[in-house]
Design a protein with these regions (language model features):
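Short C-terminal domain-edge/linker segments immediately following a structured domain
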Residues: 54-57, 87-92, 145-150
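Intrinsically disordered, low-complexity boundary segments flanking structured domains
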Residues: 6-15, 85-90, 101-103, 128
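Intrinsically disordered, low-complexity regulatory tails
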Residues: 94-179
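Bergerat-fold GHKL/Histidine-kinase-like ATPase
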Residues: 1-67, 75-81, 150-243, 247
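A broadly used, surface-exposed interaction patch
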Residues: 62-103
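Surface-exposed flexible segments
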Residues: 66-77, 127-139, 240
Length: 248
């Protein structure tokens, strides 16, 4: 379900009366002969360069001053499950597909549908098997209000951006470290004779964890009464980036 903020955003996008880098307007749902266009649009939106959710807003007539074309009884209308099945049946590289859903929004002059393409870090999303003119191995994206043509691939700078996004290289250091902490097996011990234990992230060794026991604090406090361990231990843990500590 669309949040109130999303609904306000959709209304604002419609009021702009132009398409953009993460939203597109369609007068009606894609008919059978235009299913390749649907897939192509979804891939382009999933690889958008804004690093955010994207929208295909269906039921807005661009040629009629962006008026609402009511979708209540529209032909070829799809539910979320139908759209998910459509995407699932296409062969994507690595089996990694865009996440999509269909939301309905009631406006004063009629009903519109919104295909929401969720933001994800598995970019670039690429077909490994062509589908009716949508080419395998082509990387499609969207720049301003234009999709990459089906017979072409994105520019190298755009492809580089999408791979950087996948590897979390677009994140600030403090955002990156929380992602790295999920990968316990990628942290290595630092040999040290001191009482402080150190580990570094092997693919970005500027990130270091330091922790040491606080023997003088060992013991129960009121919020540990439900714990089974009869001898709780306390540690000071620091996350270090190079030498400064962004968070203790």
């Amino acid at each position: 379900m669309l949040s109130e903020l999303q609904k306000e955003e959709i209304l604002e996008l419609i009021s702009l009366k132009q398409e953009g880098a993460y939203w597109d307007f369609k007068k009606e749902w894609y008919e059978e002969g235009k299913q390749p266009d649907l897939l192509h649009d979804i891939i382009c939106m999933s690889n958008n360069l804004e690093n955010r959710d994207a929208y295909i807003i269906i039921g807005i007539d661009e040629e009629n001053d962006y008026c609402v074309n009511d979708m209540t009884n529209a032909e070829n209308r799809k539910s979320t499950q139908m759209l998910v099945d459509f995407v699932r049946n296409k062969k994507f590289a690595g089996g990694i597909r865009p996440r999509v859903m269909v939301e309905t929004m009631q406006l004063e002059t009629g009903t519109i549908d919104i295909i929401v393409i969720k933001n994800g870090y598995s970019t670039p999303y690429v077909l490994e098997e062509s589908y009716r003119g949508v080419n395998a191995n082509n990387i499609y994206t969207r720049v301003m209000d234009s999709n990459t043509p089906k017979n072409k691939t994105a520019e190298i700078s755009q492809i580089e951006y999408l791979w950087k996004k996948r590897f979390r290289l677009l994140m600030a250091p403090l955002e990156q470290v929380f992602y790295f902490l999920l990968k316990r097996e990628e942290w290595e011990d630092v040999p040290d004779d001191s009482s402080v234990t150190r580990m570094y992230y092997k693919y970005s060794p500027e990130y270091v964890i330091e922790y040491a026991g606080c023997d003088d604090r060992d013991g129960y406090v009121y919020y540990l009464f439900s714990q089974i361990d009869s001898r709780p231990h306390w540690y000071n843990i620091c996350l270090l980036y190079t030498s400064p500590s962004p968070r203790d």
